[in-house]
Amino acid sequence: MLSNTNLNSFRSLIYRSGWLYNAVTRRLYDQDTKFFTIASIIGTGPKRILDLPCGTGYLMRFLHPDIEYEGVDLNHRFLKRIKAKELRKRNIKLKRIIIQRKNIFDFQNYMGEKKDVIVLCDILHHVYPKHIDLINIAKKIANKIISCEPYVVKPTEISARDKLFKIIIFLGKYLPKSLFKIVDFLFLDNDGINTYHQRSRWNLDQKTLKQFYKTMGFTNIQKIMDEYIAICEY
């Protein structure tokens, strides 16, 4: 998601398949409850929503039909799945749907009429140390920001919902750092955009993530498993 990025950089296995990404994240996190909660906070339409980044478009499954939705991501495979599976197979009907492949930091493309809501879901820890920049620009172009962020991002610390993944995570705790970096590069959180060095510097835990949200003006902070959903509005 960062500027001056090679869009064709190598991505890990789960970032090369929208289906696999959904399958894995649903076993690690309570995805349905998370996105249902975000959609409930957004409420009914008519409203203009900007999803940064949109990932596989999971949020659209739960949005009210009167919502105008704009999703932005750099992962062309995820966007392809949205158009081929989410919109057609699931027959998602929203008032308006715009899906674009572009850098979420291309702020000039978001200027003009304010959005009602910007959703920043599972992105801040990926763009560190530019996470504050992303929030600050979002404040200028939206009336409300909904952020969802895990306070546990290291795979060895995640409380997986699936028994198989619990075993995998347990075994992962004993991998040396050099080997874990290879596993991350090939199979885990390597999005092909943000380096392991950048992502691994994110160190906010349950207490400090909540404090960070408060410092940035977020309120109504609620916990869902290993994640916080927070709201900032004016």
What are these regions (language model features)?
Residues 57-58, 62-97, 101-106:
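Class I SAM-dependent methyltransferase SAM/SAH-binding core
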Residues 148-212, 221:
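C-terminal alpha-helical "lid/dimerization" subdomain adjacent to the S-adenosyl-L-methionine
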Residues 13-32:
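Class I SAM-dependent methyltransferase Rossmann-like catalytic core
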